[in-house]
């Protein structure tokens, strides 16, 4: 299997998973033009589309793509029914695409109906987890997002996190504002800074590393607890997550 990223809009990535025969899966096509260009260049044959949630920058290209490839099956949560979805899926469902079975699990927080798709090692997580960060809470609660991130963090160490935005540098600047002396965060910030200076993608990332570099996955870490306690005393990791998310919103 070959993993490809297609830049879209200002900072989106549309992920495409293709096999050696050229059949492919497209994830969260927010616009059609860059996908159609890549299909022509690579001679891909689209088989399916995965949608993680209903926001326009993830679904805006679906209907145009279906005009070109009407046979394609579009998987998505109920909140995407009017966006071109032809097969509504929910937590606990699975999808057989390109000969691989993808498990589907609910990750509410960014939106209430947000879902993720996982077939080892690939995780298509939309706007739930970013490298160094997590999605804004547009519809769900901090508690819901915390539980969603716990689900992702429990996946195998070598899981490839294929998230939908190039937010890594900004996320790591925020992380440094919270844990300025953390060796993992400083090292990763330097690496990300170098990549972005060359306009190179920072994704996908390996979950094992993300657990070290992403403060939103470290709410039980003693160093982070000590830093948060300098400003406020919070007993539960879920409360610490909510505090971090609120700080990031105004960073």
UniProtKB/Swiss-Prot annotation:
Reactions performed catalytically: an S-(2-hydroxyacyl)glutathione + H2O = a 2-hydroxy carboxylate + glutathione + H(+)
Annotated signal sequence range: none
Residues the entry annotates as binding Zn(2+) 1: 53, 55, 110, 127
Top-level taxon of origin: Bacteria
SMART domains: Lactamase_B (SM00849)
Catalytic EC class: hydrolase
UniProt entry keywords in alphabetical sequence: Hydrolase, Metal-binding, Zinc
GO MF annotation terms: hydroxyacylglutathione hydrolase activity; metal ion binding
UniProt-annotated binding residues for Zn(2+) 2: 57-58, 127, 165
Record text on cofactor binding: Binds 2 Zn(2+) ions per subunit.
Pfam families in alphabetical order: HAGH_C (PF16123), Lactamase_B (PF00753)
EC number of the protein: 3.1.2.6
Cofactor names: Zn(2+)
InterPro entries in alphabetical order: Clx_II_MBL, Glyoxalase_II_hydrolase, HAGH_C, Hydroxyacylglutathione_Hdrlase, Metallo-B-lactamas, RibonucZ/Hydroxyglut_hydro
Pathway noted in the entry: Secondary metabolite metabolism; methylglyoxal degradation; (R)-lactate from methylglyoxal: step 2/2
Example of a GO biological process term: methylglyoxal catabolic process to D-lactate via S-lactoyl-glutathione
Job description of the protein: Thiolesterase that catalyzes the hydrolysis of S-D-lactoyl-glutathione to form glutathione and D-lactic acid.
Protein family per UniProt: Belongs to the metallo-beta-lactamase superfamily. Glyoxalase II family.
Subunit organization: Monomer.
Name the UniProt record assigns to this protein: Hydroxyacylglutathione hydrolase
